[in-house]
Amino acid sequence: MSNQNINITADNITGKCDLKCSYAFKYSESNSTAKNNGVLIDITYDSASVSPVIYNTEKYNVSKIMITSPSLHAFNNSSMPGEIVVEHIPVKGGNNLNICIPFISSSDSSTASDLITQVIQKVAANAPSEGDSTNLNISGFTLQNIIPRKPFFAYSTGRNDYIVFGAIDAIPL
């Protein structure tokens, strides 16, 4: 999954996204595990009894979460220190949906940055080698506290739809 060539910037906006970029979510808490894949951390997410995401009237379930370093996307022609990608699969078939949020180097803190920092620290301590896995055991771990409720960029490539939050809404780490 390489989207480094996709530059997320207000200069690239074309068209108006009225009623075709409807995104609603309600994620539950998850008892996740994480796997160290070198420059990538793969995170599991518990299945929900009700699909946590509706995008353009279609329901989606979380299939996995990835933390990458550096970012997969460019933001205003620059790479960011990292990015979280939440991959969703459609309930009734169709394109996968990927929610992408960049990380920014900052001393600021938020609930999202606290959760991501805990994931990274637990992987570093309990799964230090590539291929190692660990149970995260993070109280209150939910994507509800990570995904911004802000405007976003949207694009499609082949079998994947993307929602990407801009650098202004990056998670401070």
Name each model feature, range by range.
Residues 1-173:
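Alpha-carbonic anhydrase
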